[in-house]
């Protein structure tokens, strides 16, 4: 399995690759959110149905703007997200109409997070866009916590793994509906 630094992944992502990388709590799997073929590959690797949707991670809110429908979100709702970001909080926000169903799943919303993890931020900065993010594991299995676990579960099905350390969190991100405040998952 190819091992790269966060700044080296842009070419892999641009060519439709799927990479594993460290996040705040577990290893994640990512790809280009604007490439449906790459998203389909990621879903096949993970054995995850597209209908569930995926998360976008970013180094800044500006990277997320092309994917979210700001006309359906109030300033107060946005401020609630800004108060938590960067950090382990994912917000479910109305998606723009042209966002691929491969990202949204069967919803008109998209889950987004501005990460505080140094390597995630460096990857998004290098790619100049957010990345698709889901835990690095086969559906129904425990998320990978080590490079060895990534190798065991995903092996040669992915294009590269980003070298780096997991963050200090023991929990996945909290997922919150930005419009209602409903917590889908407590982190």
From Swiss-Prot:
Task: Look up keyword Nucleotide-binding and say if it applies.
Answer: yes
The protein's location, in the record's own words, is: Cytoplasm
| Gene Ontology cellular component list | cytoplasm
Disulphide connectivity of cysteines: none
**Ranges where the YrdC-like domain occurs:** 3-187
Catalytic reactions on record? L-threonine + hydrogencarbonate + ATP = L-threonylcarbamoyladenylate + diphosphate + H2O
Q: Which Gene3D superfamilies match?
A: DHBP synthase
> Which InterPro entries does the entry link to?
DHBP_synth_RibB-like_a/b_dom, Sua5-like_dom, TC-AMP_synthase, TC-AMP_synthase_SUA5
Q: PROSITE patterns per the record? A: YRDC
What's its EC? 2.7.7.87
Q: Which family does it belong to?
A: Belongs to the SUA5 family. TsaC subfamily.
According to its UniProt entry, what is the function of this protein?
Answer: Required for the formation of a threonylcarbamoyl group on adenosine at position 37 (t(6)A37) in tRNAs that read codons beginning with adenine. Catalyzes the conversion of L-threonine, HCO(3)(-)/CO(2) and ATP to give threonylcarbamoyl-AMP (TC-AMP) as the acyladenylate intermediate, with the release of diphosphate.
Can you say what this protein is called?
Answer: Threonylcarbamoyl-AMP synthase
Tell me which species this is from: Shewanella amazonensis (strain ATCC BAA-1098 / SB2B)
Q: Name the gene.
A: tsaC
């Amino acid at each position: 399995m190819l091992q790269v630094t966060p700044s080296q992944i842009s070419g892999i992502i641009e060519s439709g690759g799927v990479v594993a990388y460290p996040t705040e709590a577990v290893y994640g799997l990512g790809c280009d959110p604007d490439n449906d073929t790459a998203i389909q590959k990621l879903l096949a690797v993970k054995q995850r149905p597209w209908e569930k949707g995926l998360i976008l991670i970013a180094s800044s809110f500006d990277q997320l703007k092309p994917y979210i429908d700001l006309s359906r979100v109030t300033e107060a709702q946005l401020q609630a997200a800004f108060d938590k970001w960067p950090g382990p909080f994912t917000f479910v926000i109305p998606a723009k109409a042209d966002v691929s169903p491969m990202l949204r799943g069967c919803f008109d919303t998209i889950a987004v997070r501005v990460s505080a993890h140094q390597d995630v931020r460096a990857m998004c900065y290098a790619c100049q866009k957010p990345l698709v993010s889901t835990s690095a594991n086969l559906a129904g299995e425990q998320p990978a916590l080590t490079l060895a676990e990534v190798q065991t579960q995903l092996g040669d099905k992915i294009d590269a793994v980003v070298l780096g350390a997991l963050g200090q969190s023991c929990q996945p991100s909290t997922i919150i509906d930005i419009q209602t405040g409903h917590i889908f998952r407590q982190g």
